């Protein structure tokens, strides 16, 4: 049997992806389907870390008239709801997990400790990172880049609602062009909406490739881990 291309991965799942067609809150069927896809990767022996967004409950930048710092902290708390929901779905399918938060809330999760996170991964536990970086003004994409660098992940899998990176929104422009491969400088200079410039710069500086792919297609996470050509690769 072919071996996975990557031994340790960082999977970034947006809050919107967890909401499914509802676009708000958590959709049980969607989370269970995502968990089944993750199980396929887990069964290959791959070490999996996950960063979840919180956009299905709250977006810091959408809090008009609100103090930005307060709005961002509200968004961090939203990621905890998603992390616990995903943890429950993963464990119901037999995968051991740990949730680590960048803001301490010991009654429901471990505080983020790098060495502990790495040890969990080595013991084949899935680690879910919540609360972003614990600091306002930083996105969960930046969290994924930062944690990936800290735990020595070999790749970031960026699960989106579209099947890659386009030169314009494919939902609006039917003639939008999809990119198979991009450089980090393309992402930073062209503002293609893959991730913010802080996250892209972190990945560039630490030589962490990013694979952007559609989460809605079953088996895509496995395909990415096995090295098949899907979505858009940024490197």
Curated annotation (Swiss-Prot):
Keyword Oxidoreductase annotated: no
Places the protein is found: Cytoplasm
Chief location of this protein within or outside the cell: cytoplasm
CC annotations in GO: cytoplasm
Alphabetic keyword roster: ATP-binding, Cytoplasm, Kinase, Nucleotide-binding, Pyrimidine biosynthesis, Transferase
Coiled-coil residue windows: none
The EC number(s) this enzyme carries: 2.7.4.22
CDD domains: AAK_UMPK-PyrH-Ec
Disulfide pattern: none
Top class in the EC scheme: transferase
Cross-referenced Gene3D superfamilies: Acetylglutamate kinase-like (3.40.1160.10)
Record comment: activity regulation: Inhibited by UTP.
HAMAP family listed in its UniProt record: PyrH_B (MF_01220_B)
Role, per record: Catalyzes the reversible phosphorylation of UMP to UDP.
Assembly and binders: Homohexamer.
Family stated for the protein in its record: Belongs to the UMP kinase family.
Stated name of the protein: Uridylate kinase
Source organism: Acetivibrio thermocellus (strain ATCC 27405 / DSM 1237 / JCM 9322 / NBRC 103400 / NCIMB 10682 / NRRL B-4536 / VPI 7372) (Clostridium thermocellum)
Gene responsible for this protein: pyrH
């Amino acid at each position: 049997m072919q071996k996975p291309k990557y031994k340790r991965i960082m999977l970034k799942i947006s809050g919107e992806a967890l909401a499914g067609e509802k676009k708000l809150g958590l959709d049980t069927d969607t989370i269970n389907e995502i968990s089944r896809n993750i199980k396929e990767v887990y069964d290959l022996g791959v070490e999996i870390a996950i960063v979840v967004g919180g956009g299905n409950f709250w977006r810091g930048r959408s809090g008009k008239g609100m103090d930005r710092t307060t709005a961002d902290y509200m968004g961090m708390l939203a990621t905890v709801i998603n992390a616990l929901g995903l943890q429950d779905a993963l464990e119901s399918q037999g995968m051991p997990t740990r949730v680590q938060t960048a803001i301490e809330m010991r009654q429901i999760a471990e505080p983020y400790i790098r060495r502990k996170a790495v040890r969990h991964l080595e013991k084949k536990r899935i680690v879910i990172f919540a609360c972003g970086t614990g600091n306002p003004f930083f996105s969960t994409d930046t969290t994924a880049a930062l944690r990936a660098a800290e735990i020595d992940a070999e790749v970031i899998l960026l699960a989106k609602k579209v099947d890659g990176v386009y030169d314009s929104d494919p939902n609006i422009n039917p003639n939008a062009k999809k990119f198979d491969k991009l450089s980090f400088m393309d992402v930073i200079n062209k503002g293609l909406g893959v991730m913010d410039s802080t996250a892209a710069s972190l990945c560039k500086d630490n030589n962490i490739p990013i694979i952007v792919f559609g989460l809605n297609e079953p088996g895509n996470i496995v395909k990415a881990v096995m090295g098949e050509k899907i979505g858009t690769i940024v490197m």
